[in-house]
Amino acid sequence: MFGYVIPNQAALDDEAKARYRTAYCGLCRRIGALHGLRGRLTLSYDLTFLDLLLSSLYEGESECVTGSGHCPIHPIRKINWRHSGPTDYCADMSVALHYYNAADKWNDDRSLLGLGFEKLLDSPAQTAAQRWPRQCSAIRTCLDRLAQLEAEGSEDLDAVSGCFGELMAKLFDYKQDHWSPELRSIGFHLGKFIYLLDAYDDLARDEKKGAYNPLRTLSRQPGYEEEMREIFELLLARCARSFERLPCVEDADLLRNILYSGVWLKYNCKQAKETPKK
């Protein structure tokens, strides 16, 4: 369930593209500094969005460090990067999320890939849990509850998506301060959107494999596509409403690009593939 919170590159100018890339590379750099090369395997667009959001909201509360250099992914060409205080938090959350997700894949599906990834990230995840016990405990609790609902074959969309929404709400609540209500709202509705879009995207594959998907029954009902579109629009509207209440200035246009356009890219791509050509 990663890789949905992405920028719409086609709608960004060169400066905005460069700023996104420096944030993405800055997060990768901090993951590597805190958790080594194996930690870099957890780099995602989703946590880059959280880093951009928190760095913008808490701009000025910590130094923004910039630089350029080589890395294992770019050993020849120098790349520019930037990071601030929230970046280290996002680096830890990136490792923790992927660790617990891998553990669930092993426990639920006996996925050897999940087991291998869990073992690989065990030490970094424990380090992250020591620094952020509240958030890491929430990840574990929410994923356990979600796994139980999925094992029961639940098709209560609000319940199953709400588990992942609650997880994301806890992650977005960085400092438990006066911005917490809006941050939790963004995380909650974005998390529900991610979970349901992932189920929507995987439906045909899951049906072919006989795997669990909460949309299986609903997908056979008249008006399924229209209902899913309405659900996605409602969740993102609530997410955007909470974002607009935050005093974000730095990278605000980049954040809006992601929230208003980028998050729709995979949905639009699926629609384009399924629309018959005239």
Mark where each language-model region is:
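Short, electropositive alpha-helical surface patch
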Residues: L254-Y260
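Acidic catalytic motifs of isoprenoid enzymes
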Residues: M1-S185, K192, L196-E233, R241-D251, ...
